[in-house]
């Protein structure tokens, strides 16, 4: 169950777009305004709907269906890497358990001879 949840979170973060419920328009994780221009591209942090913005976010900002659809969550790359590490550790533990079970079956079969 935890693996599925972590995978869902990872996929959502990789899509770089989260749709919030109308009651919660403020993202949980967000860079401070004074740092946003220095650390992220202007097409992501631009809040104006001017025609000079290029890229895929320009079409989204010009056609706002509702105010909460344009909310973006900006995270550092450490978060997805951390989630990948968790998923990798879980896969290693599962593989080790499977190998131990296989070894136990082999030893039980050899012990019967």
UniProtKB/Swiss-Prot annotation:
InterPro entries, sorted:
CRF (IPR000187), Urocortin_II/III (IPR024270)
| Ranges annotated as spanning the membrane | none
**Gene Ontology terms: biological process:** adenylate cyclase-activating G protein-coupled receptor signaling pathway; digestion; hormone-mediated signaling pathway
Asked if the keyword Secreted belongs to this entry, the reply reads yes
* Positions of the propeptide removed during maturation: 24-71
Complexes and interactors? Binds with high affinity to CRF receptors 2-alpha and 2-beta.
Family stated for the protein in its record: Belongs to the sauvagine/corticotropin-releasing factor/urotensin I family.
**The protein's name in its UniProt record:** Urocortin-2
Q: Which organism is it from?
A: Mus musculus
List the taxonomic lineage. Answer: Eukaryota, Metazoa, Chordata, Craniata, Vertebrata
Gene that specifies this protein: Ucn2
